[in-house]
């Protein structure tokens, strides 16, 4: 079943990418980094001018670089993400077995995972390396309960190697362990998360960012820099409450008092999402809440003592999960929003065929992932690019009628007018896509 669902996830993600709905952030970004690693070049993004390790400390991306050295393809990222999300059900099954649930109830726990809206939506939303370690996160919970300290510690190290933000999950595990009076385990998890955070913020990030610390922290929490009253007023109370309700909706009816320690694992990450200045942290569309889905399903497992023979309302439980998935997941995007560029597919393919591997290309955000396996590629961000003086770009592939995320019609029109005045060779298509090459 996990294989079939993994194939379905991969098909959906690949279809979205093929329909020109993926973006520079983040599929194009990670695709370029993986390609640069595979080519033996410095993995510094031409879009962000940032080393791969200075982004989120995700050293596990070097594994993708090894795959790219054999055969460079964005499908490495999409397929690995799809299958790791699907196969997270395996350690969830083991956790359910460990708790004494019957095989039928173990299947129900797997179904609850597969039907988490944030799981499906994360699979669709480009690529993010923390998806690789969701099986390891669930397995780490199993290893702790099975008294496997070495396995547990190794899994935590791998967890941290996919994204710096997962220090919040490891810190949450320390809280859970302290609640259960497992003091040595708690101290180990807390020490590991604090050490990793300090190593990144005080050494690695400044080393690779010319003395600067983590880029996301300033953006996420700058609104909290005033007094307490100002900070309270700046919080998104309504959006935060709705986010919590929608996030918990598939599982909340299955939690019991016994679930509370497990739910504490997600508390630090949930708090950061609520405090963030960006509303995207408080949606089920993005990947920021993905680890919380693991926590919520494991909390359902922990709600049931081993002596319980059956979970009441098996069909109702599964049916409710399906209803929540249909309401909050985004499969229906394939019947509408994801079809918005179908008429431009042939034009885009023809234009891309004229782009050479060595070209430095400035294009729309949704075309970046189609051509990101090169040393220089980016999209014209609004407010950051006024002209092409000393920019080094030799190809523009833009569509002012559909400028894509982060750009504007006016900016792209101005850039095209500028290169036409400079005598670049330009070709356009019926969809208003225009390719200009420097002579």
Please describe what each predicted stretch is.
Residues 106-117, 156, 160:
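Short helix- or helix-capping micro-motifs
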Residues 122-130:
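Short acidic/glycine- and proline-prone juxtamembrane loop motifs at membrane-interface regions
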Residues 75-100, 120, 139:
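Transmembrane-helix motifs of polytopic, lipid-linked glycan transferases
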Residues 12, 22, 26, 183-268, ...:
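Membrane-lumen/periplasm interface segments of specific transmembrane helices
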Residues 11, 29-52, 59-60, 144:
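Extracytosolic helix-loop segments that constitute the early lumenal/periplasmic catalytic or substrate-binding loops
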Residues 2-3, 104, 190-194, 305-330:
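Signature aromatic-anchored transmembrane alpha helix within multi-pass, membrane-resident enzymes
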